[in-house]
UniProtKB/Swiss-Prot annotation:
Protein location: Secreted
Species of provenance: Deinagkistrodon acutus
EC number: 3.4.24.-
Lineage, top ranks: Eukaryota, Metazoa, Chordata, Craniata, Vertebrata
Top-rank taxon: Eukaryota
Cofactor note: Binds 1 zinc ion per subunit.
Function: Zinc metalloprotease-disintegrin AAV1: snake venom zinc metalloprotease that binds to the platelet collagen receptor glycoprotein VI (GP6) thus inhibiting collagen- and convulxin- (a GP6 agonist) induced platelet aggregation and the tyrosine phosphorylation of intracellular signaling proteins (LAT, SYK, p76SLP76, PIK3C, and PLCG2) that follows GP6 activation. Interestingly, blocks platelet aggregation but does not affect shape change. Also degrades the Aalpha chain of fibrinogen (FGA), followed by the Bbeta chain (FGB).
The record's account of how the chain is modified after translation: N-glycosylated.
Positions bound to Ca(2+): V7, N10
Name of the molecule in the record: Zinc metalloproteinase-disintegrin-like AAV1
Domain Disintegrin, chain residue ranges per copy: 5-10
Something else known: Negative results: does not cleave glycoprotein VI (GP6), gelatin (an irreversibly hydrolyzed form of collagen), fibronectin, prothrombin, and gamma chain of fibrinogen. May not bind to alpha-2/beta-1 integrin (ITGA2/ITGB1).
């Protein structure tokens, strides 16, 4: 899933 904050595990 694409989220605003770049988190590990898009």
């Amino acid at each position: 899933d694409v989220v605003s904050p770049p988190v590990c595990g898009n």
